[in-house]
């Protein structure tokens, strides 16, 4: 009995050392040999993306000093990607900043900010409160309309196969995008639309007819809606309410089709969408070009051929896609996953990113300052 008592006392003596070790093991985050990434993929991307992730796996293995393979699933919806991260069906994903705003920043391990090439005249993260959005738009309008869009040529306007390079800054990356408000009409009509805007007369502005995208679109609905709330104040009921109250003043219209419907003089679109929209010189009705017959036949001909298209203003910025990682992975895994993307981009080995508009990456070191502050300034 005495011997058993001494053994028990000895066990109890070392119990405080055993318990923390047990807890540490049970809470240790994993360092898996196989990782699953959820990515979006452009329809023009090909099998080279698989080769990229082979290269990515090799670089990640070297950084972690162990064999790690990365496989990917193609998923476009950010909310599905987030769900997969939260339920351990995926280890890493690029998601849009709207989904992070809707779910709450505290829910995520934000490790990577994607970047894209900057447009001319818009290289800084300016907001409506700074008073620069309209002047930026005016400068881009000058560049856009120097040669009418219908006359743009591959050589003169530097078409690369995916965009017109003359609209972009050289070697300048930014981490945001915007929406824009396009307007069309005769010089007199455009003057009056601008007056309604400058005088903050919502009803007058709306009566010119507004084209918009789906309610889930950032550039074609959400960002313009946020801007209108700030600009028109209490006289503006919100975009969806305005549509419900005055359905005859609104229509679902693509920005590139502006000028085809005489009842719609204002259209919301992704900022500078003409930059990646190729001009077909043989087209009957050119994009971003008011048509003489509105595309509806001779019975509705109008004097549109002298009408213009301008950018009235840009919207506040929305952050470009953000890389999130599962919190079940160890810190060194999380750091390595982000660093490999950055390194491959800097050495021009990133095949995946540019295929989807990611031209660079930044490591996120302060999520509150780098992400949350921007979201708050845009959403108010």
Swiss-Prot record:
Spans annotated as Disordered:
285-304
UniProt entry keywords in alphabetical sequence: Cell membrane, Lipoprotein, Membrane, Palmitate, Signal, Transport
GO CC annotations, alphabetized: plasma membrane
Pfam families in alphabetical order: CypI
Q: What membrane topology does this protein have?
A: Lipid-anchor
> Where would you say this protein principally sits, based on its record?
membrane
User: Domain of life of the organism in this record?
Assistant: Bacteria
Q: Where is the lipid attached (S-diacylglycerol cysteine)?
A: 27
Q: Does the keyword Phosphoprotein apply?
A: no
Query: According to the UniProt entry, where is the signal peptide?
Result: 1-26
| Location(s) in or outside the cell | Cell membrane
Q: Where is the lipid attached (N-palmitoyl cysteine)?
A: 27
InterPro entries with a match to the protein in the record: CypI, CypI_dom_I, CypI_dom_II
NCBIfam families on file: MG289_thiam_LP
Provide the function of this protein: P37 is part of a high-affinity transport system.
Q: What is this protein identified as?
A: High affinity transport system protein p37
Say which species the protein is native to.
Mycoplasma pneumoniae (strain ATCC 29342 / M129 / Subtype 1) (Mycoplasmoides pneumoniae)
């Amino acid at each position: 009995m005495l011997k058993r008592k001494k053994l028990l006392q000895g066990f109890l003596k070392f119990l405080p050392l055993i318990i923390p070790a047990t807890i540490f093991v049970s809470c240790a985050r994993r360092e898996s040999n196989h990782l699953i990434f959820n990515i979006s993929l452009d329809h023009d991307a090909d099998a080279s993306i698989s080769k990229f992730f082979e290269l990515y796996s090799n670089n990640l293995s070297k950084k972690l000093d162990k064999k790690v393979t990365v496989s990917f699933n193609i998923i476009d919806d950010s909310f599905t990607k987030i769900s997969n991260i939260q339920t351990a069906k995926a280890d890493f994903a690029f998601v849009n900043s709207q989904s992070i705003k809707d779910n709450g920043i505290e829910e995520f391990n934000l490790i990577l900010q994607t970047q894209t090439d900057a447009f001319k005249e818009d290289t800084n993260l300016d907001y409506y409160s700074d008073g620069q959005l309209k002047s930026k738009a005016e400068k881009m309008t000058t560049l856009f309309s120097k040669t009418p869009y219908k006359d743009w040529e591959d050589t003169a306007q530097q078409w690369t196969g995916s965009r017109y390079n003359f609209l972009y800054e050289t070697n300048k990356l930014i981490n945001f995008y915007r929406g824009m408000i396009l307007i069309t009409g005769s010089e007199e009509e455009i003057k009056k639309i601008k007056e309604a805007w400058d005088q903050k007369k919502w009803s007058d502005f709306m009566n010119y007819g507004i084209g918009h995208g789906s309610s889930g679109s950032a550039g074609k609905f959400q960002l313009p809606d946020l801007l209108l709330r700030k600009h028109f104040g209490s006289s503006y009921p919100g975009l969806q309410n305005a549509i419900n109250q005055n359905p005859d003043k609104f229509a679902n219209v693509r920005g590139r089709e502006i000028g085809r419907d005489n009842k719609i003089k204002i259209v919301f679109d992704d900022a500078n969408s003409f930059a990646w929209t190729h001009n077909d010189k043989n087209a009957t009705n050119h994009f971003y070009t008011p048509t003489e017959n509105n595309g509806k036949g001779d019975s509705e001909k109008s004097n549109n051929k002298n009408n213009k298209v301008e950018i009235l203003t840009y919207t506040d910025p929305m952050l470009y896609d953000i890389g999130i990682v599962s919190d079940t992975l160890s810190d060194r895994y999380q750091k390595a996953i982000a660093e490999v993307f950055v390194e491959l981009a800097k050495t021009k080995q990133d095949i995946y990113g540019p295929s989807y508009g990611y031209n660079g990456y930044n490591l996120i070191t302060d999520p509150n300052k780098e992400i949350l502050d921007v979201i708050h300034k845009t959403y108010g």
